[in-house]
Amino acid sequence: MKKSTAGKKKIVIIAAFVILIAVMAAMFMIVRYTPTKEKMNGYTYFDLDQSTDKTMVIVDEKQYSDTGIVSDGRHYLPQEFVADNINAGFYYDKESQAVLYSDSSYMYTYKSGENVYTDDTGKTYNTDYPVVIDVDGECFIAWEYVAEHTDCEYSYGSQPERINISIEREARQCVTAKKKTAVRYRGGIKSPVLENVAKGDRLEFVEDIDDWVKVITSTGYKGYVKKTDVSDIFEYVREEKTEEQHNYILKDEKITLGWFQVSGTAGNSSIDSTLSTAPGINVVAPTWYSITDASGNMSDYASADLVNKMHQQGIDVWALVSDFDTNVDFAELYSSKNARTNMVNLLISNADRYGFDGINLDCENVKSAFAKDYLQFVRELSIACERKGLVLSTDNYKPEAYNTCYNLKEQSRFVDYVIVMAYDEHYAGSDAGSVASLPFVKEAVEDTVKLVGQEHVIAGIPFYTGIWTTTSGQTTSRAVGMQAAVDQLNSDGQVALWNEDCGQYVASYTVGSSTRQIWFEEEKSVEAKMQVIQEENVAGVACWKLGLEKTTVWSVISKYNK
């Protein structure tokens, strides 16, 4: 009996031990395979001071810490930050100490702390909150108002306070959550949770890592979700939000523009002889106006007689405005609302007086220090031109990193045509080379189209070339017309050979102790350029300048520009 009892005890002990082992194993498995619910501190993730009361802003994945503020429950962002990173249209005018914003028809003025704003006709508009506030001398704009006027997508996040903004519209790879799921800091169920997302939430796909998918949430977290918890990858392009668009004035036909240089009113009389050998032109841009001082005054060589002659031939006239007077303080000019208004009023009144059809801004001395002020002038002139039915065009350099301050994308919101000057590849003072090689022209047109849109782009080509002379290592050049370059070659008893790479005839030869080089512009080089222009299907071609061309190039231009 005792033996039996002892055996039973032994069995009980063994059973208890087995159960204990099983429980411990189960607990181990539970601990090992149960996802942690621990949340990562958002301030730690974004590397922010937890005591900050500022709003972080993320724009197309770029983080800007301690940027915005919250006032009366609304997010406000610095005006300068908004203009530089989100919407260049919100401009701060130092002279009136107000924010200016232009849509397709009006310019609006917002004073700090006021629940009312006005347009340029004097009409007032009421708001439930001040669009603009001043905090310690810094101008802030209500994000809610900015978002209403910006083509973007955004979400709010908290702890820390943040706005995640998407402006770019490129196609993105995305997935959706199949169920409520955790987005974790690292790939693994023991990694802390960044954010819980709901079933159906869209997440931007970054990459696959084994059983996990790296994603970006709508509030800006980059983390990991289990691959089984999300859908297959799909392509997403955010819906375009309709912005206030300029009511463009575009011609139904391809534009063939000729710049007509005059240095005084008497020069207008040569228009008949100049155009007698230039068939196919439908726009003439005479160099009538030049800014002469920081108050916005201009020299005026305009002629109603020239306009009437052109109209009788079915040719439009776009009066050119230049900024070549280096004595003018352009920073002072463009930053002054009074000066900008003076220029606008002068040009509009002269359009009434002379009857020209458009304005061509040839402002080639804009610097980054005052480029925002220049763009505001373009906006203000655009509104005035639209009201008068005047075409507005701007002349611009080939897009490069050094001239991004011209902001062609912003210009294109307000001007009818952006003319890219696809020349001056080499210029007086540079090394010897082509004024406009074919690759240079092609790149200029393609890069402009990417920023502007083909229906608004006019490709500018040269009717001139350079004759380069190098003596004892010193290079000089002189600009000449097409025939003058040929005459120089013939006078020197030399020949030029076609260069396929640059799309031009090229000559290089010795004259005494000097080397002379010429990259020619003529029918064949113009044809190569016109083929590019036709392929890009842009709005037309502009030619600098009338009188420098061989008459035979016009049939080539007409062949492709139709």
Feature-to-residue mapping (PLM):
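Primary recognition of N-terminal secretory signal peptides and signal-anchoring hydrophobic helices
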Residues: 2-209, 231, 238-250
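SH3/SH3-like beta-barrel fold
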Residues: 101, 200, 213-217, 225
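A short macromolecule-binding patch
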Residues: 175, 219-230
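Glycan-recognition patch characteristic of GH18 chitinases/ENGases
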Residues: 236-346
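Glycan-binding loop/region signatures in secreted carbohydrate-active enzymes
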Residues: 238-241, 463-529, 561-562
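Short, acidic/polar
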Residues: 263-278, 336-352, 400-409, 521-534
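Conserved, mostly hydrophobic/aromatic
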Residues: 284, 361, 418, 459, ...
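Substrate-binding surface in catalytic domains of secreted glycosidases
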Residues: 294-301, 345, 368-489
